[in-house]
Structures are given as structure tokens and as C-alpha cells.
Amino acid sequence: MKNFLVIAGIAACVFTCSAPEKAKDPLIASIDSVMNSAVDTARFNGNVLVARNGEVVYQKSFGPSNFYTGDRLNDSSVFELASVSKAFTAMAIMMLKEQGKLNYDDDVKKYIPELPYDGMTIRHFLTHTSGIGEYEELLLKQGWDPKRIANNEDIVSVFAKEKPPVLFKPGEKWEYSNTAYAMLASIVQRVSGKSFGEFLSEKIFVPLDMKHSRIYKTRRSGEVLPNYAYGFIYSDSLKKYDLPDSLKDYYYVYTLDGIEGDGVVNSTTGDLFKWNKALYTDKLVSKATMEEAFTSGHLNNDSLHGYGFGWFIENDPRQGKIVRHTGSWPGYRNLMMRFVDSGDCIIVLTNTENPSARNMVGNELKRRLLTTSATK
């Protein structure tokens, strides 16, 4: 019996010594370090997905989806994407162009004749070079009833009525424009004969199996989505997180809840990764069309402005082409960054008014991916 126990003990020792616990992947350990620091020092609250060479290596959730109830975020949590939505608007235009229903250099008055401007093209709208002013300021100037939710047709009507001067001649400068992308959504609706939400669902979300993605207007629809990540703002005076609807400085979240094209796509990190993968294929549009979307446009003087169709464009000497977009709306700060040549991807969705946390995570994860790529 003693001999048996001795032999068993030796066998156990040999087994445990020959099969040590697998060390954590250095990249995952590095990402964990970034995220732990962001949570501890910057109050990061949200979901993160990191892909390496086209495969997900990290997907985690941090914090509550609802600070009132204490419900926690998970992989299926749905976030308002804010301006990350613009890439979907651009894709809708690209699809209609491939169908022969419009051209990038068409004058926008061909589709929205109410606009009081000449020389603005769809390409100008796609690349933020049209010179059109912002609708938010125009609505406020007109004395819009804050208890009334505006929609895209309201924006068109206000511009037709007020005829505000352009900020600059089309193509002369680059200036980010939410109005341009709202107008693009109106063009999609008028050309396709479908609502903007229907078009995105039928042509993008369903074909890509993005089951948790849709146009969603929290206040206008009255519908409550399961697993919804409610956007909260930390009130310094109250020392707690509150919904923006409860804070007087953010009353416009109600007024502008009906505007489509510049925001209001809602999605998950997992669905956005499906979107990321599809952009490498010709499932939605041809690869030639995608290449044009990922190429910086230029101004009238031929200088590049660093924006394609719905994406900021960056060329890194170590990692190649990077396309990205951030999204900001009261209670949300988001980022999607695609390393086109390597297949790496960073998706950061947050449901708190905390741009420093998003920026910290995005910049650090980019640095870690680039560093790892350089030492392969």
C-alpha cells in the first residue's frame, strides 16, 4: 500500500510538473493592464473588443448598463453609436451608387431641391467639404419647441426657409458636418423609397446577421430594448450618475432624437465586428468601391483632408492604413478603429459621458497593437 502511495505521489508530481499552467498571452495581458488602469483611474464604463489578424482576442464588459438599477453590461449590450453611425450612412450611399441610382458628383439639389444652395454634391456631403451649416444651431435660432422631436424633413424645411449662408464654398475647406450626413440619410430615403432604418436593416444588418443592430430612437419610439446600455452623465453637483434627460443642460437629447444619418444606429461590439469583417469582402459593395471609401478626399486646391466616406483615414508607417471614427452623444463616447492591412480592430463603446476614458483606452490599445505588430 505504501509503495502504491509513493508511486502515485511521484506520478502526480511528474504530471503537475510536466503540465504547468499556460501563461497568459502577452497581448491579452497587456490589454487587461490597459483596461484595469482605465477602470481604476478614468472610471471607464463600457464594452471593449479587440481583434488580431481578423480574429477576436479580447471581448469584455466593464460596469453597469443602467446606473439606476445596477444591471450589468454584457457582450450583448446595445449602445447608441452616435457618429460611428456615419459609416453606415456612407455605405447606404455607396450601395445606391453601385445600383446606378445616384452618383457621388450629383448636385444634392437633384434629390433635395428644397435646399437653397448650388454646387454642393453628394461627394461634398460624404467628405465634410460642402460648407453647409449645422442644423442644431439653426433649430435653436429658429426657436424650435424643445418638447417637439425634430426629424430629417424638419431639417430640410428649416434650411429651405431660413436659407442660412454657407460657411465656405463647396470643396474649399474641410469642416465636420452632422447636417451633411443627415441630408445623406434623406437622400437614401428619397432614392430608395424606404425609410432610412428599413434600408439599413434590409441591405446591411440582416445580410450580415447583425441581430442586435438597428435605428433606435430612445425617446421617440417609446420602445424598451433588452440589454440596452443607457447613456449616463456624472453630475458633479449631485455626485451621482443621471440620465441626460434629467439634466437641464442636455434638454436637446429629446429635441434631436428623431434625426437620422449622423447618428442613432445602435449596436453591440459583436455586431460591429461582423461589420468590420464584411468590409474586407464584396458582400455589400465591390472592393474597388471600398477602396475609394478608405481613400482621403481632397480639397479644391488638391490638398488631402484625411477623410474618406464615413471614415477618418490615417497611414501608419508600421501598421499601414488605419480607418477610424469616434462617436459622441450625451451619455456615450465610442470608437471604432480598423487596421485595414493587418486585420486588427479596436471597438470601444461606453455609456458614460467620459471622453478621456474612451481616448485613453483607444490610444493605449492602438499603441499596444502597433508595438506587438512591430516585434512579430
Where are these regions (language model features)?
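Bacterial Sec-dependent N-terminal signal peptides
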Residues: 1-26
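Short, conserved catalytic-motif segment at the N-terminal edge
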Residues: 24-79, 101-106, 163-164
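Active-site SXXK
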Residues: 35, 48, 54, 78-106, ...
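A short acidic/small-residue loop/turn micro-motif
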Residues: 63-67, 256, 353-355
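Short, glycine/proline-biased beta-turn/loop segments that scaffold the active-site neighborhood
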Residues: 104-118, 206-208
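Short, surface-exposed loop or secondary-structure junction motifs
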Residues: 119-326
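Short, well-ordered beta-strand elements
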Residues: 324, 335-352
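Short, gly/Ser/Thr-rich active-site loops of penicillin-recognizing serine hydrolases
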Residues: 352-376
